[in-house]
Amino acid sequence: LGHYAGIAGTGAAIEYLNRIDLAELQEHEVSLNRIITDGVAGISGVELIGPADAAARAGITALTVEGCDVHDLAIVLDEAGGVMVRSGYHCVNGWFQARNLMAGSLRTSVYLYNTEEECRHFTDIFSDAVNALS
């Protein structure tokens, strides 16, 4: 039997991507990523993984926080602020281990449906959570 749900889903995804302006999407992601990057820049112990320029990271921001367990931080962000992030190795265990980042990272991702307000909310809650846990 064919994988009809997968075929229909792929067709819907292609239609969706054809309707959006990818350059506009990229500009939006970078703009939101800059808000996050700037918002966490002054927090003691926070280190950005990857290029400093948000344009080189598109919609992804990965962070380590000295003295904080990223899994605990993710739970606090969710429970205290309704902010959903990922924590851990993000399917690249070897990359983290080769750099001795044994705790993994906290990762945010933004997309077309995210807003500047949501990104500012993240940076506020993130700052509070880091201060509470470190």
Locate predicted features.
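Pyridoxal 5′-phosphate
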Residues: 1-134
